[in-house]
Amino acid sequence: MSSAIERKSLDPADEPVDEVLQIPPSLLTCGGCQQSIGDRYFLKAIDQYWHEDCLSCDLCGCRLGEVGRRLYYKLGRKLCRRDYLRLFGQDGLCASCDNRIRAYEMTMRVKDKVYHLECFKCAACQKHFCVGDRYLLINSDIVCEQDIYEWTKLSEMM
């Protein structure tokens, strides 16, 4: 389950910080270190307030409050995306090399086939594809536009 992280600012003009609970900024307690939050900037996640340095992944320790990071909270653990996928994601097999694809790896998907990025290349000339390149999927083989005729002819001979 992914959770939103809200960045808050502690400014005397912004009292109270939490409109629902009517908590004044001086009474905020960090969900990590249990100390009072006196910093100007702090975070709100999992229904708690946090110092920016205290909200971190329970496994690798990376900071979860950084811009662009997502917090995953499952079974009482705060996790970064990589660790969440490592623990709860599903692995698969590459349609080209038949080796394991870990849940956190970047992949290319064509119909029901999944490929490692390094395996997503023309079966004939071994050229890696770029965005916008045209190709044809023949069985589990990916063939670039330039090699389609030769590859089809070769396949018919076998």
Curated annotation (Swiss-Prot):
What InterPro entries does UniProt report for this protein, alphabetically? LMO_RBTN_TF, Znf_LIM
Q: Which Pfam families match?
A: LIM
Q: Which CDD domains match?
A: LIM1_LMO2
Instruction: Cite the SMART domains for this sequence.
Output: LIM (SM00132)
Any single GO CC term annotated in Swiss-Prot or TrEMBL for this entry: nucleus
Listed GO MF terms: DNA-binding transcription factor binding; metal ion binding; transcription coactivator activity
Q: What induces it?
A: By bmp-signaling. Inhibition by fgf regulates the timing of hematopoiesis.
Q: Which residues form the LIM zinc-binding domain?
A: 28-90, 92-154
Q: Where in the cell is it found?
A: Nucleus
Its keywords, alphabetically, are: Developmental protein, LIM domain, Metal-binding, Nucleus, Repeat, Zinc
Organ and tissue specificity: Expression becomes restricted to the ventral blood island (VBI) as the embryo develops. In late neurula and early tailbud embryos, also expressed in the dorsal lateral plate (DLP), the site of definitive hematopoiesis in the tadpole. Expression in the DLP diminishes during tailbud stages. Expressed in circulating blood cells of tadpoles. Also expressed in non-hematopoietic sites, including the tailbud region and the central nervous system of early neurula embryos.
An individual GO BP term: positive regulation of transcription by RNA polymerase II
Biological role: Transcription factor that acts synergistically with tal1/scl and gata1 to specify embryonic dorsal mesoderm to a hematopoietic fate. Induces globin gene expression together with fgf.
**PANTHER family named among the record's database cross-references:** LD11652P, RHOMBOTIN-2
What this protein is called in its record is: Rhombotin-2
Q: What is the lineage of its organism?
A: Eukaryota, Metazoa, Chordata, Craniata, Vertebrata
Q: Corresponding gene?
A: lmo2
